[in-house]
Amino acid sequence: MKLFKIVTYVPIKDARVVRIAMGDAGAGVLGNYHHASFSSKGVGRFTPSKGAHPAFGGIGSEEQVMEERIEVICEKEKVKDVM
């Protein structure tokens, strides 16, 4: 069985919902466990360019958002569902 690691960054307020959705789609299965993941918190920085539709801030303005990095493992067959 080939496993892949999927990593994503989400605003902290959305992290629980994203972790559950990834687990429900088949990520995080380790033996007799499911919905397994690892998270770490940090600051995400970005500047939206023209044509962007930022959830935070505005075009051309640097933003900083507290984010959670979520890591899960996933069987190859489930990657598309998890993504």
Locations of regions flagged by a protein language model:
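Hydrophobic structural segments
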Residues: 1-83
